[in-house]
UniProtKB/Swiss-Prot annotation:
<comment type="pathway">
    <text>Amino-acid degradation; D-alanine degradation; NH(3) and pyruvate from D-alanine: step 1/1.</text>
</comment>
<dbReference type="GO" id="GO:0055130">
    <property type="term" value="P:D-alanine catabolic process"/>
</dbReference>
<dbReference type="Pfam" id="PF01266">
    <property type="entry name" value="DAO"/>
</dbReference>
<keyword id="KW-0274">FAD</keyword>
<protein>
    <recommendedName>
        <fullName>D-amino acid dehydrogenase</fullName>
        <ecNumber>1.4.99.-</ecNumber>
    </recommendedName>
</protein>
<dbReference type="GO" id="GO:0005737">
    <property type="term" value="C:cytoplasm"/>
</dbReference>
<dbReference type="InterPro" id="IPR006076">
    <property type="entry name" value="FAD-dep_OxRdtase"/>
</dbReference>
<dbReference type="InterPro" id="IPR023080">
    <property type="entry name" value="DadA"/>
</dbReference>
<dbReference type="InterPro" id="IPR036188">
    <property type="entry name" value="FAD/NAD-bd_sf"/>
</dbReference>
<keyword id="KW-0560">Oxidoreductase</keyword>
<keyword id="KW-0285">Flavoprotein</keyword>
<feature type="binding site">
    <location>
        <begin position="3"/>
        <end position="17"/>
    </location>
    <ligand>
        <name>FAD</name>
    </ligand>
</feature>
<dbReference type="GO" id="GO:0008718">
    <property type="term" value="F:D-amino-acid dehydrogenase activity"/>
</dbReference>
<comment type="similarity">
    <text>Belongs to the DadA oxidoreductase family.</text>
</comment>
<comment type="function">
    <text>Oxidative deamination of D-amino acids.</text>
</comment>
<dbReference type="GO" id="GO:0005886">
    <property type="term" value="C:plasma membrane"/>
</dbReference>
Amino acid sequence: MRVVVLGSGVVGVTSAYYLARAGHEVTVIDREAGPALETSFANAGQISPGYAAPWAAPGVPLKAVKWMFQKHAPLAIRLDGTQFQLQWMWQMLQNCTSARYAVNKGRMVRLAEYSRDCLQALRAETGIQYEGRTGGTLQLFRTQQQLDGAAKDIAVLEEANVPYELLMPADLARAEPALAATSHKLTGGLRLPGDETGDCQLFTTRLAALAEQLGVKFRYNTPIDALAMEGGRIAGVKCGNEMVRADNFVVALGSYSTQFLSGLVKIPVYPLKGYSITAPIVDAKSAPVSTVLDETYKIAITRFDDRIRVGGMAEIVGFDKKLKQARRETLEMCVNDLFPGGGDTSKATFWTGLRPMTPDGTPIVGRTPVSNLFLNTGHGTLGWTMSCGSGQLLADLISGKRPAIQSGDLSVHRYLGETAGQTRPAYA
């Protein structure tokens, strides 16, 4: 079958690769000049299935109020003047219960664990290189309350059979030797030895090249205007004066998916603004060896070959992509506090991107009420972590194969109430 994939970020490119490997004729369309030039360009770099968890969690509403008065707050909110933002935040609040958190985290871990398995198989099959490391990830706690609170996450990890280690301050240097100098600031850590790291932009670029070898056509610098309906199905996508036709269509447009699908399928995907800096390593012994996550500031610090990537934070501010110096200062403070002398932050590049977030944290992957329209979006801060599994899952669905994991609760239908064949929008 002919399949058009809209979007060439890591989610779009993995979708195209797995579709091509399944024997489909695939075309990828993107407005940018190449793959992974927006949200996938400079993310935090961790592939963390075990840490897959929704931002909508018990206690977050109260924390959000406190964060409003903190200089280095991990979350910031500014009204963007749209009703959609208010609706999205309200639905996110409804997911901040213990019961909803457990359900949402459970399905996120399910997809993320499967995705890591798919990535490992892909790496073994192709030999793709992307400055990846398989040294696990380490979540660091600065307070006793954070350490005690890890018990809830550990329960979910045990239920999903995810290996873990709960480390005391004296043990942290076993996982990250450079923390020997700063472990006195910490109360402990949760290590997941099965997690990985890597440069998402490098991976996406090289996977796109592999996809081309399988026959995938990439059309860059191409406007994506609208989907055209004929007889209850998608007939094609309007790209300027051209209509590109296919049998099936995949929307992998990240935060822009919601507006693009307006009037066709209503999805609650909102841009969650994040920041990163990338600093050259000046002392390898003082730098991390894998990924460290600072629970207090919600910041990830990741080691690439000769660089340190520091990324995180979340701003609910719409499509504002301005770089804020205060956010850079927070990222620099965090990495210099934990790994002083490891990298030269004065020479770091500064970046921001918009992560496509759903109010429950789970991405939207799968079928829609339109028979030949499929979605692969809404991965939030876990697009890199979940990309391969989402791409394989989508390829299986389009190919008519039974997916390797439960997938019904990952589709858009969890937001849609269907009665007598009629679909009610998520916010009707």
